[in-house]
Amino acid sequence: MTIHFYTFSNVRGGSSRQRAFRISEELERRGFSTIIHTPPVVDIARTPWPKKFRLIIQILRTLPSIKKDDIVFLQRAIYSKYFFVIMVLYLSLTRRRMIFDIDDPLYLHSFTKTKVFTQMATAVITCSHGEMEWAKKYNAQVSCIHIALTMSDYEKFSNPHEQKNTPVTIGWIGTGPEHIENLKVLAGIFARLARTHGEAFRFVLIGALGDSRVYDIFNTIANLEVSFIDTLDWANPESAPREIQKFDIGVLPHQTDGEWNKAKTSFKILEYMACAVPTIVSSFGEMPYIITDGENGFIAENEDDWVEKLERLIADDALRARIGRAGQERVREAYSFDATIPQYIKVIES
């Protein structure tokens, strides 16, 4: 049996890297045969004609390699109508087993394609409980398996909590231009903190990508010391944890309104926690399943809550160490590949 992955993007895309390429590697280590087919679906969608025709032919040529007992694994593969039609026809004619993986509430903007793949799937894997509840309307075989990470890549960059940093470093990492509205959540919080604790903390934002909108959110806040790192080598598994290790506090501001946010989750929260960095998150989506407030992290319900919990962490070295270590243990037990790959294997073998 071989598992045939068709992915949203190449390995440089975070979703496909963690939900397909890394899964493939981990399954191979455990004796499974896997293959990742190219081109990625998003390349088909974005490539103009007549070059698009060549990519479609490439996909068609992969289909004869899928044998009777093999499994087709579609990772977020809804972004090309041509790929969608090809795969629907192929699966309908051959009755091959198919696993459909979604890590965002894709049904909110691509309802029909997401619904059809969900209905056709032998099994569906979602990344949040909100997505799982939606998928269960159309398929009984649904598992919630959260995006995971390789724990060893992060543990060696654990924040040691051995010395007091002055000022305390509050950090955020991500693709800044994609999170403008989420980052704006921090603006009012930092403005209040900077008025009373301006010399006690600094802010580091990784992933600004040279976008002036990201810079402007924070450069206008009086008394706020802020540093921007435009980009990292995201394909290098050590680049992010090496920088996160320097954070004393990790923050994940996020909008909370709307169906999209109710079903969302985050990878960066796991990266903070895996490096033993105490974390504060907005109350959205999957966060209450990951964090127990006050035990392995903090969940902030509103701006006042953010300010109060940041003040506590800024002032208390021992609290930062305790929360950071508890968060790291939480990721090790539930959100590392050692924890999630057995769940994938159970789906594959069922």
What do the PLM-derived regions correspond to, one by one?
Residues 4-5, 162-191, 203-204:
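Conserved donor-binding/catalytic core segment of Leloir-type glycosyltransferases
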